[in-house]
Amino acid sequence: MLQNKSSEENFPQSSVPLPAQQSFADFPPVGINSLALYTPGFYLDLTELAQARGVDPNKYTIGIGQDQQAVAPSNQDIVTMGAAAGLKALYFADSADASDTGHTNIGLLVVGTESGVDASKASALFIHDLIGLGPWCRSIEIKEACYGGTAGLMTAVDYVHTHPGKKALVIASDIARYGLNTPGEVTQGAGAVAMVISENPRILALEPQSTVYSRSIGDFWRPVYTDMALARGKYSTEEYINFFHRVWKQYKNETGRSVKDFAAICFHLPYTKMGMKAFRGVLDNDISDSKSADNNNNKTGASADSDISAHTHGHFLKETLEKRYQASTLYSRQIGNIYTGSLYLSLLSLLDHDSSLSSGDRLGLFSYGSGAVGEFFSGILQDGYSHALHRSHTQTLLHRRHKVSVAEYEKIFNDAIPYQAEDVQTDQVHRDPWNPFILDRVEGQERIYRRL
């Protein structure tokens, strides 16, 4: 394995401005028009898992910040989960656009995943068929670890910008598996998040400025002969933090923005404490710098009052951003790690749980995919965005799940589709009645899907 040692890069001082004739101000805003979640109808209580593994439950629930973990039976994979989320995202978008009930405006379907079901055929094509999209549609799959969902989103935004009147469906779908009784077992999970990307979006208009950083490292990988990932956990956490600090510093250089310009920042969350590990240092440094700048600008006059004002504002800002970070983790605490969808699960959780956000607020998003790619970008909440959310639907999805015992979870885990050339009938006992799609069987080395 190649191990590249990092070196200090010289950050460019500014990005090249767009020519006037190509200014983004000349085009309609593009972004997230609808947002939908699917996660399997079964979950494991991590306190019970900790007890079965002889571990203090606080290590799971407090130490890494996880309470429950989604469990996917063999009849559910990234295709069935992605189709369920995608169908809901289309329905949510159609509820506000009676002109496109046939989805004819969807010109691009892109699936970001690191749990692909075929080395040749894109999972997007299976999903395209299951949800009934028309044939005049580009359907592709993108892979770069947990960054794949963001790669799909950026591809979709570019597509919509260059195809006026068209929309794109982006699906981030994954099953995180590390093995029974392994260090990574507590950070497993399963689910899919789907987004319709359009002009004049109802939820979040993405801003053109983003900063992306790539470097080949060996923090996490999954060989093609297994569905279980391998990781250097401590090293991966260090690089996650390092990548965030790098892209944040570069983003600040390019835009002149700091944390005070954001109402909230959402993170990719392999586990819910991880984002705060990266955020805390930046938060403290930026607020400290902001206080110093405010104090320097108020050297004359009532400097004591200025000091108090700067301190009070800095404390309030930090408290607000930390509170909103916690709101962004609530769904992840109940579902676990869904790889490509984790950042967008964080976004959905924030929007569903924090009613103090307002239209016009700027949200920051940090995407990280091991191997590794990191990107920081932002978006502006749109007027009436809360009416485009479906919080009660998502809450019902989570509340109606069935809790499985540790023994039942282990049986389901071991029942996964094998990486062998054999016919397999999938689990017919653990069916989610709320997902109309299942993987029925593997026959002649082909996956056979069915709509119930």
Regions found by a protein language model. Give the residues of each.
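Conserved catalytic cysteine-centered active-site region
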Residues: 56-80, 114-167, 173, 285-294, ...
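A conserved active-site cap/scaffold subdomain adjacent to cofactor or substrate pockets
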Residues: 237-254, 260-284, 331-332, 336
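Condensing-enzyme catalytic core mediating Claisen C-C bond formation in acyl metabolism
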Residues: 2-75, 182-242, 377-452
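Acidic, glycine-rich active-site loops and adjacent beta-strand->loop/helix elements
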Residues: 37-38, 112-118, 144-149, 172-177, ...
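Short, well-ordered amphipathic alpha-helical segments that serve as non-catalytic structural scaffolds
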Residues: 56, 78-94, 123, 239-255, ...
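Intrinsically disordered, low-complexity terminal tails and inter-domain linkers enriched
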Residues: 5-16, 95-102, 287-309
